[in-house]
């Protein structure tokens, strides 16, 4: 999705900083999130992504910098007066209330007319695929259903921005994958800007329009998922987002994804490929694929994956210790600059 700025961004952070004593949790970041984006803050634990989300929500006060929501500076504005809602991993539902009362709670506090509350409650439950659940209690629902109730409660009062703090972290893998698809679909339908925090790279790549990669309180890169994965700016991004190979050739550090590397038949030349010889030092069967680790004759080690296909193959599956020829297209090798922005700042 391409965004053309015709109005102020829904979120603008300028020099945003957060200190806890001498610890720098967020180190002067700049960031803009456009209306209607599904924007993800991705990073390891302690990288500053959740602290940034909490400052946007108003739960934490910045140590420096500014936060704008839809063009208005909101420093000092309490959370309940900001045009944002937050969905947490623990759902934060009222167990004694019905699903319908949970969803409509914010509307009741805002003194919305009873008939309008009921209409918007039912509309929100329909959006999250839970029609007919209004009279149930949260304790009668599965984890995925409770998460959808929390989402319905967050969108029912039509916030400008929805903040989601690792909302799928407590779900099992299959349900989490299902909810990723549903969340993206719901976001597209309601048109609300989503800012999503996660440490899960697959989750970020699956759902996001753009991703900001956090590390040590700084932003390493902001890109669309494909650009982030295929053209990482530095070694940290290459290593954190998926699996990557890093080798040095002709004075450059190159990153190559395992799925871009091919096992070649030495007797059959392939035009347009850069090829190198090496030896298989590890073989790991992983169901649909087999993972190989190859020590290259010219230095460096590569990981590559090969689908476990039935039937004849141009190249026999190599055993550990085998001498092999591997190759990749030059455009699939991306040059990276340095290890991280933190290293650049320190130097």
Outline where the language-model segments fall.
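ABC ATPase nucleotide-binding domains
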Residues: 38, 77-233
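The feature captures the beta-strand-to-loop junction immediately N-terminal to the Walker
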Residues: 42-44
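ABC ATPase nucleotide-binding domain helices that frame the ATP-binding cleft
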Residues: 50-53, 149
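Helix-to-loop junction immediately C-terminal to a conserved catalytic motif
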Residues: 57
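Conserved ABC transporter NBD signature motif
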Residues: 65-73
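Non-catalytic connector elements of ABC transporters
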Residues: 244, 253-347
